[in-house]
C-alpha cells in the first residue's frame, strides 16, 4: 500500500484550532486531519449532502497545490507512529469501543434483543426437546463415529486419562523417532487410572481401548479381568512397546479420521458424496498451523488454489448456495498477519486474498474468511472492506465472512457488515459461530493486564449473544445470507422458528462440524415427507494429513470433552432434557435473580486486574491492537517528544545544573533525548550524609504508611505510562511491547513489596539495615531500578540509587514519581554516573549498610571483595544482593510442536535484541528434529523487522551502544573464523537498511556449535547458539549446562512428563520454563533470580527478598509471610519430611542438652526446605516456587555449642555441613548419631577455602569474621554469603541456606486449556 505526502498550507489560527480540537479528544492533529478527509470522502462517495465551506476557504480551495520542498528538518520522534494510526468510520469506532466492555453492560443490552416472543419460545422449546430426545434415544452411532464418541464420553477432560488422551493425540503422529513415540505413550498411559474405566461404558470399543488402547490392533470381544490387568501392566512396560505403539497409533488415526473428511481435497470430495445425496452441502477447510515463514504461506496459497480448482469443478455450476464452498484462514496466507504489520498485510496478504476470491468467483463457489483471535478481527474487516469494492467482484454474492458470538463486539460487527453489504451493493454470506479461541483469549487478557475480556466468561451469555446476533442477521435477507453454525438443539430450533415457516431456497442455512454435528442435522436436512425439517445444512469439513490435523483435533477434543458442550451433555443420560434445551435468556434471568444483576462474570474467572486475589492488583497493560489505545498513545508520545528530559543528581538539597552532556537515542543519532550529568564527588558525599540522617526518620514511618506511599507511586507510574513508554523507546531502544511490559513490571514491584510490608511488618520487630546503595542496569532501566528501590524503601532503608550511565533519564523520572508519591527528600536520592567513579565511591563508604546490584558477574565479584571486610553495628557482614547473567539454554525434544518452539525461541533469544539476563543463549535440539526446526527458525527470523523501535512495526530494536555492538560483532566474527555456520537475517527494506548503518543495530544471528562447552561466556545480544544432542545423551547435556557454573534460566519443550521431571529435577537453575518462552518473569508469579555464577539470591519479586534487607526480625517472620500466602493454595511438603530425618535424630540425641533440643525443635518448626508452593497466575499456566537446601554449608566455630547450633540449622534445611578436619571436630562427630554424622564432611583447614560450598556460618570474634569474609570473597566462582555471629548466638537465618526454584509450565501447550474449558 504505497503512501504519498501531500502538503496543505494552513494559517496559524486554523493550525491552532486543529491542535486544540485534537487534544480535546486525546488524538493527534495528524489523526484528526486524516479522519476529516476520510469522513468527507465517505459522504462524497455516498452522495450525501456536504456541509457548505466557510467563505474564507472558497478562495483557498481554488489555489493550486504547491509541492512541498523536502527540508532537512530536525528529527521528530514518533511521527511515523502517528502516521500508522488508522482513521475510523463511526460504525468501526463503535466496534473498537465495545472490545472489552464490562460484561454486565454487554449482557443487559443483549437480553431484550435475544428474547423470543412467547409463541416462538414455546415452539422452539418443543422442537428442541424433540430433536434432543431423538438424538439421545437413537441407537449409538455405529462404526468409527460411535467408537470415537464413546471414547470421548468416557475419558472426559476432567479425568487424568482424558487429558492423557488429548496429549497423545496432539503429539504422537508428528514424532519422527520411535524411541520418543514409545516414551510418550509410556508417559501418558502408565500414570492413568485406566482400570477405573473398565466396564463403565456400554461401548465395546471403549473397553477395548481401555485395555491398552487397542494394543493388538484389533478388537477383542472377551476379557478375563485378572489376566488383562496383568497384561496391561506388561504392555505398559518394555516388552509390549511395539504392540502398544501400533495400537495407540491406530486409535489416534481413528480419532483423526472421525474429524477429518479426507487427507487430500480429492479424497474429501469423494467422501462427501454420501451425505451430499442426503441433501448436505460442504465447506472445505485446508488444515494447518498459522504460517510462520514465507515458505509456509506460499505452501498454503498453493494448497488453497488447488482446492478451489477441485471444489469448483466438483460444484459443476451448482452456485454459491447449493454447491460446495471453501473456508480460508488469513493467518495461513501471511507469516505476520497482525495489526503491527498492517502495511505488509495490505501490500502482501491482500493480493493473495483477492486472487483466491477471483478464482472462487470464476467457479461461482462461496469463499468464507475464517474468524481467528480477537486482535485480528478489525484488520480482517479492513481486508473484507477492500475486497468488497473490487470492480472485478462487483455483483458477486459469494464473499463470506465468519463472526464469533462469544465476542462482545459481535452485534456491532453485524451492523457494520450490513452497512458494508449495502454500500458495496452485494449480499454477504455471514457464518455465525460461537467461537473457538475462548481459553486463549482469557489467558492473553490476564497476561497482558488488559481492562477486560473480549469474550463472555459464561457460556450461557454466548448462547444469548448468538440468538441476538441471529435475529439481526435474519432481519436483512436482501443484504445477508446467514449461515448458522451450531450443534445446540435449542439454538437450532429457535432459529428455525424465528426465520418463519415460509422458507425459500437461499434464505439461510445451518452449518455443523464434520464428525460432530451430523446426527443432529440428519433430522433437519431432508424432505418434510420423510419427517425432516427441510432446511439445508453445510458441513464444515477439514482436509489434511494426520500431521496437519493435530491442533484441530485437540480443539475438537476440548470442545467435545468439555462438560459444558451440548455434544458432551446430550450423551449424558443423567442430565434431564429440559435442562439441556433450556432457553438461555431465561437461564440468565435466573442467574440475575440469584446474583442481583444480569451479566455478572464467571466467579472462577477474575478480571485481569483482580488476578492475584484481594492482596494485590495486577498492573494495567495497553492493547497495541486497539485503534483507540494506539491513537491515545500516539497523542501522548507526540506531545512529550519535544520535551528535553534531564538527569542530574537528586539530593535532599537543590543541586547546581553543571555541565550537561546530550543523551542520544541508540536507534537514531539525530534524536537527542535529553541531557544529563554525573554526580560530583562532593555531591556523593553529601548524599551519603543525607542518607544517614534520614534513615531513622524513614524507619520510624509505620510500615503501613510506607506501603501506602509505594502504592501511590504505583498509581502515578501507571498514570504516566504513556510518557514513560516514550522515554524507554528513545533512551533504552525498547520496542513498544517491551516498554509496556517494563512499566508494568515496575508497577508490580511497587504493589508486591508494599503488600508484604503492609501485612507482615512491624517497626518494633523488623529493623532495617540503614543506607542501601542500589546499582541498576541499562537493560531494565525502570523495572529493576524501581524494584530494587521499592524493596529497600519498603523494608525501611534510605536509598542511594546509582542508575546505569546509559539510561539516567528514565531513572530521573522514576525518582520524581517516588518523591511525588510522598517518599521524603533525602530518603531516596539519585546519583547518576559511571560505576568506576560514582559507584566506587558509594560502595567503598563505611556508612553504606547494604548493596543491591544487577549487572555482570565480574563487577558483582569486585563489589563483594570491596565490602568483604566491612561489618555493621551488630558485627554482621554487609549484605550484597547480586543478580547477574547466565548461559541460558532451552532443551527441545522431538515430541515438541515445532511451530510453538519457533515462536518461543524467537521471543526468548531476540526480543529486546537479546538484551535480557534471562534471554536464551543456547538452543539444544534433539538430532531427529534439528534440521526441520532450524529451517523454520531461519524462515521466521527473516520475517522479523529490525529498526527504530519508535515504529509499531519494529520487532527488534538496537543494542544499547556502540561498545556493545562491537563486542557482539567480535564474537560473531570469531565464530565465523572457527568455521562455525553463521546465519543472519531480518526483514529488510531500504529505510531499515539505512537506519542499520547509523544506529547501533546487530542483526539476529544463529550460530551452530559443536558442543555446549564451546560457548565460554555470555554474549549479551541477539545471538543464538545451537547445539544438537542425541536422545540418549540428555543426562550428559544437563551436566554440561550445570558445568558452566551459571544457573539463571532454562527452558524445555517436550510433551513427556518424565523428560520434564528429569530436566527440572537435575538442572541447577533458578527459573525453569516448560513449553513456553523463558523471558518476562512476572513479579510474585515467577520470582526471579539465579544461582551459582548467576546470582546470590534471594529472588526479586519473591517472599524472601525483603528479609535480606533487614538487620533484625523475629525468628518466625518468614513463616508469618508464607502462612498468609498459603491460605490460597495447599503446600506440598513431602520432601520436607524426608529432609528433616537427620535433625530428628539430633533432637533425640540432645536429650541431655535442653537448650540444643529446644533449638532443634525451633528450627524444625521454622524449616521450609523441601516445600513447594503454587503461586497465583494466569489461567493455562502452572507456577510453583520451591525451596531446596543449599548443597554444602561451611561451618566455622571453635566452641562445641556453636558447632552444634550451626549443625542443627544445616540439618533443618537438609544441607551437608563442611567441617575443618581437626581433633575438636572429629571428636564431636564421633559422638553424633550415624544419621547426623553422615551429613558432615571434612576438609583440612588449609584447604577449606578451595572446597565447594555455597554458604558459610561463622561464630567468633569480629576480626576473625573479617578475615573469613575476605577469604570467601577472594575465591573464584560464585559469590557466597557469610552469616557471622558472636559466640553463643543462635539466631541463624534459615532462609539464607535455601535455594529458590521457580517453575512455570504452560499447561495449555498441548493445544488448549482443559481445566478452563470444563468450568462451565
UniProtKB/Swiss-Prot annotation:
Residues 653-1119 are annotated as: Aldehyde dehydrogenase. It holds the Pfam family Aldedh. The active site is at residues 883, 917. Its EC number is 1.5.5.2, 1.2.1.88. The gene is putA. The lineage of its organism: Bacteria, Pseudomonadati, Pseudomonadota, Gammaproteobacteria, Enterobacterales. Pathway: Amino-acid degradation; L-proline degradation into L-glutamate; L-glutamate from L-proline: step 1/2; Amino-acid degradation; L-proline degradation into L-glutamate; L-glutamate from L-proline: step 2/2. GO terms for biological process: cellular response to proline; negative regulation of DNA-templated transcription; proline biosynthetic process; proline catabolic process; proline catabolic process to glutamate; response to proline. This is Bifunctional protein PutA.
